Amino acid sequence: NTYSYAAAEVIIPHVLGGNLMELLTLQTSWQSVCENTELMVAFGGLPAFNSQISNGGTGAHIQRLGVIEAASAGTKFINLSPRRSDVKSDIDEAWYTLRPNTDVAVMLAMAYQLLTEDLHDDYFLNKYTEGFEKFQAYLLGQRDGVPKTPAWAADISGMVEEDISALTREMAKKRTMLTVSWSLTRQQHGEQPFWAVTALAAM
């Protein structure tokens, strides 16, 4: 497995089917983001300094321009990262700092809130996913006695409870795209952010 996203390579076939390399060829274009995305929530940010790396020669590094164009088209960017610079600084973006390795706690709290406030998409979950009832039980604390509330996640992540709640409600109201930096796989339990964000997006 590659160093860049080894944990994702392992978990993605079990969560989405296929393999990660195939899925990478289907990534969303910046043009599509500009046309369809009202809110982009970036776990780990969108650091331009190491995006679109090339194995050799020169590559077309379009992310910086893509972010600017999307912001100009009305996309609001949310940077969830310890570093503010993980999203281009000259666009209007909101930054919420998280303790390293705590992104999944915030994702779970968002999923909990979508569930308990009836903001989730039952039709999509029933038609296109399997096993949501087990995930639901985990979110509600039926398996371990710990409901995955925004207050629970705030204590772990350092993100303010009210900010988690407000952002979750905003995500439910708008056409939202969730992104996860490959860097989140390079930590203990690095497969979990990709699994959790897939479940959150499905909701």
Residue ranges of predicted features:
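Short acidic, glycine/serine/threonine-rich loops at helix termini
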Residues: A7-E9, S51-N55, K88-E93, M107-A111, ...
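Anionic-ligand anchoring segments at beta-strand to alpha-helix junctions in alpha/beta enzyme folds, i.e.
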Residues: N1-N36
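Long, well-ordered, tryptophan-enriched scaffold segments
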Residues: A71-I78, R83-K173
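Glycine/threonine-rich flexible loop motifs
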Residues: P47-H61
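A glycine-rich, hydrophobic/aromatic-adjacent loop/helix-cap motif
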Residues: N1, M171-M203
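Solvent-exposed loop/turn segments at secondary-structure junctions
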Residues: Y3, L46-F49, R83-D86, L184-T185
